[in-house]
Swiss-Prot record:
Entry's Gene Ontology molecular function annotations: structural constituent of ribosome
Organism: Roseiflexus sp. (strain RS-1)
Keyword set, alphabetical order: Ribonucleoprotein, Ribosomal protein
Protein name from the UniProt record: Small ribosomal subunit protein bS16
NCBIfam families in UniProt: S16 (TIGR00002)
Keyword Cytoplasm: no
Family statement: Belongs to the bacterial ribosomal protein bS16 family.
Entry coiled-coil feature ranges: none
HAMAP family associated with the record: Ribosomal_bS16
GO terms for biological process, alphabetical: translation
Keyword match Mitochondrion: no
Gene Ontology CC: cytoplasm; small ribosomal subunit
Amino acid sequence: MVTIRLRRMGKTKQPSYRLVVADSRAPRDGKFIEIVGHYNPVRQPKELHVKADRVRYWLSVGAQPSETVVRLLKQVGVLDADGKPTPTATTPVEG
């Protein structure tokens, strides 16, 4: 199974995290498929950047976000209050 989770980076006592798509069996800081954002809780205000289109893609193909990632994605607006992806505006395609 593929998960969207945090990967710890940074120095000792100064953590920063990358939001990565990884196989659920891989170690926390091990091999990953794609980086979809980063989160720095040390800076004030806390810094969070997410590639929303890539996160929506991975959710659409069945990736499971961790509990912490769900909370962060709700803050950014990628997920709604129920934890489901927010709908995106689509444009009609001319045939």
